[in-house]
């Protein structure tokens, strides 16, 4: 019996690994995928959703669910830690303090807007509002995946949040080059190759989408946009730490309330299980190590390649365990919320960029 369970667990791991490799092969073989803003992570989850929703494979997938769940949870955390090898603290200096200030302002305003509208206006589940806010404010699917273990959201909510990032991030790819032409006409006095790069990097959802949108403008805009985007990505670690501490605080409040009512047993378990996620802390540590340049370049490149594979496998696992019927239940409200947040990124984020640039030049 144990040998059979071990085989099924291993089979689940192998299935996710094969799906991850397939996603990597597709994105490397077909350039139009990345040029269209469909990143490796997006392709991986789409493959997983396709496989997981095939009726004749449902019973087989259920046999391997232990390995699939392990990939979606544990392998994902390892992938997030290794994601730090793509970043360095020196990136901040390359764009300057202005870019950092704009990034922080856009991040805080976007996430706050998503939470407020999602919960207060659209009456969405708190976890879904947080996931949409994190994906829009930080770095798309990677941020949503990293936030999921903290909020312990259901698979369907994660997929709904990721779908909003894909939809409106793809729209960004075509909208921003048009915006650039209009901006040059109305604000001819501003250094646009640099400033518009900061604008794209601080407001577009995914790294791949930033590249696609910025490359449509110019190489200089693309360079600045990517560095600015990387600074946004670096906010992921602190964000996860703060978010987890918020949940700890919430659990403590529940513990006090239930203790006063004479029933606090279950909340103690909840408090113990809501500790600060180790992967968020290690994510920052890895960025620090990468910033020191201690590892050879070849080793860093290998670790980045491994990380791409791990994240792709985790995304495939997420897709496999997601079913269309559950996504339909979410309705149109998440899409409306994401649309408003997207409009804020385009116009509100643009206003933040203009105000910050003008004040900086005084």
Residue ranges, per PLM feature:
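Small-residue-rich segments of transmembrane alpha-helices in multi-pass membrane proteins
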Residues: 15-21, 44-48, 70-84, 106, ...
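Juxtamembrane and boundary regions of transmembrane helices in multi-pass small-molecule transporters
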Residues: 117-123, 172-199, 231-261, 354-362
């Amino acid at each position: 019996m144990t040998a059979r369970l071990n085989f099924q667990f291993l089979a689940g791991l192998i299935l996710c690994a094969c799906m991850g490799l397939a996603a990597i092969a597709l994105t490397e073989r077909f350039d139009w995928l990345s040029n269209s803003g469909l990143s490796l992570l997006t392709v991986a989850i789409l493959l997983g959703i396709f496989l997981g929703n095939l009726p004749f494979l449902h019973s087989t997938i259920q046999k391997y669910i232990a390995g699939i769940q392990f990939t979606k949870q544990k392998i994902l955390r390892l992938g997030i830690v290794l994601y730090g090898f793509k970043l360095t603290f020196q990136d901040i200096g390359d764009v300057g303090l202005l870019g950092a200030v704009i990034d922080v302002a856009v991040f805080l305003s976007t996430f706050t807007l998503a939470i407020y509208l999602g919960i207060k206006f659209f009456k969405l589940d708190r976890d879904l509002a947080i996931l949409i806010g994190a994906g829009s404010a930080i770095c798309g699917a990677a941020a949503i995946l990293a936030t999921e273990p903290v909020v312990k959201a259901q698979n369907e909510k994660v997929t709904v949040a990721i779908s909003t990032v894909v939809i409106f991030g793809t729209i960004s790819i075509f909208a921003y080059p048009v915006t650039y032409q209009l901006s040059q006409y109305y604000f001819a006095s501003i250094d646009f190759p640099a400033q518009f790069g900061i604008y794209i990097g601080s407001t577009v959802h995914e790294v791949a989408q930033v590249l696609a949108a910025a490359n449509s403008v110019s190489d200089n805009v693309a360079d600045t946009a990517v560095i600015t985007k990387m600074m946004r990505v670096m906010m992921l670690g602190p964000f996860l730490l703060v978010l987890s501490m918020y949940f700890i605080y919430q659990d403590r409040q529940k513990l006090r309330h239930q203790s006063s009512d004479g029933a606090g047993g279950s909340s103690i378990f909840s408090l113990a299980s809501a500790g600060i996620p180790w992967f968020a802390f290690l994510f920052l540590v890895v960025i620090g190590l990468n910033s020191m340049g201690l590892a050879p370049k070849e080793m860093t490149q290998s670790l980045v390649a491994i990380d791409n594979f791990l994240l792709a496998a985790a995304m495939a696992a997420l897709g496999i365990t997601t079913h269309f019927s559950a996504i339909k239940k979410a309705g149109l409200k998440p899409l409306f919320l994401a649309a408003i947040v997207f409009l804020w990124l385009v116009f509100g984020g643009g206003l933040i960029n203009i105000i910050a640039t003008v004040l900086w030049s005084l």
